[in-house]
Amino acid sequence: MKTMEFIPNTSQTLRIMTHNVWNKDENSPQWELRGEDCSASSRVGGLLRVYRELCPDVIGGQEVSALMADLLKEGFQSEPINYTLIWGRFTPIFYRADRLELIDSEFGTYPEKIQGYDGSFNDVKSKSWNIGVFRVKDNGALFVFATTHLWWKKSPECEDDLSKSHCQVGSDEARTQQISLLLTKLDEYRGKYNCPAILLGDMNAGYHSEAMQTVRANGFRHAHDIATEYAEESVGYHFCFPSGYQTSYYNRPFESAIDHIYVIGEKEGAVKRFERYSPDYYFPISDHSPAYIDLQL
């Protein structure tokens, strides 16, 4: 594990986070056999610890079930920061109302069907987006914030073996269409408020994928590419599933990471740090490490 130099956020800096917390409400038999518990009620304490240690100003969630959202809201009441919730089906937003004022918001789910391809590309309606427009109370700066979770299955290697549960032809195209819908929506909000925007989430797509190239073609820049003080090179991912978990993080290049943070319209040099948080206690909490940026507006 990387030894992290924690730099707290200041009144001049916003800490913006994306976090897939793992949609797992109940314990699994495999964990129970090991005397462990992966239920939401067991894991919420680890999530609260992450937020207590990092103090993000905005958290864009993915795989946040209704139960987990309730548990987090209950837990926040006893924490140093009592985050305010903007509801969204599996993609809620939590924000610091002491620092930020909510100006506007909108939530939506992606279509289940993709023209030209069979099957569902949003089978449990968890693939969605959530937008919040915020005003920074200290200086009046506005920004648009969007969290999203794109379709998860793979497609290029599936052409000759569709029996694999993680394969579905058209999945790459689905992600590109999904993110294109959100980019259009963000254009509307940026046009309305004339301010920077932050787009983040679990994209289920690597840096060089068609979906992520589409984001950059629309003018967004990856925080990793423009951070002036520190840019994380790890992927922030490890094995943590109903069958169990492992106590090591995957050693893969940054380009293969699927949790991304993009910005547009910010001042040059505004993104100071792009990081992932992967402490040892986090192994049984979620397969995705939270990623965050420090941003000056």
What are the functions of these language-model segments?
Residues 18-43, 111-123, 151-174:
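Acidic/histidine-rich helix-loop elements
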Residues 1-4, 187-198, 204-297:
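Metal-dependent phosphoester-hydrolase catalytic domains
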Residues 20-21, 148-150, 202-203, 289:
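Active-site metal-binding loops of divalent metal-dependent hydrolases
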Residues 14, 57-58, 143, 196-198, ...:
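Short, Asp-centered acidic motifs that coordinate Mg2+ and/or phosphate
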Residues 128-148, 160-203, 208, 212:
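His/acidic metal-ligating clusters that form di-metal
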Residues 6-8, 58-153, 275:
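Structured beta-strand-rich core segments of catalytic domains in phosphoester-bond hydrolases
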Residues 1-74, 297:
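N-terminal, active-site-proximal structural segment of metallo-dependent hydrolase catalytic domains
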